[in-house]
Swiss-Prot record:
Molecular function per GO: DNA binding
Family statement: Belongs to the UPF0335 family.
Protein name per Swiss-Prot or TrEMBL: UPF0335 protein Mnod_5968
Domain of life: Bacteria
Amino acid sequence: MAASPVLAVDNSSVAADQLKSIIERIERLEEEKAGLAGDIKDVYAEAKANGFDTKVLRKIISIRKRDHEERQEEEAILELYMQALGMA
């Protein structure tokens, strides 16, 4: 038995409304993300103006995001490789 045309229109209308809502939410979040990226850029500029090395700041932030054990393992491997190359 085929679905009635009214039911098909209602389902497609609901799907269209959901899709529109999802797209609008993503667009709003993308705008917020762009605003936050601008704020972060401003903080780095402030740090640089105060004499801080922004490359080092970015590295520290990257390190702080990682798990302590994962970071220790990577540092141990780095030390091993540097010793193998006569750099340590």
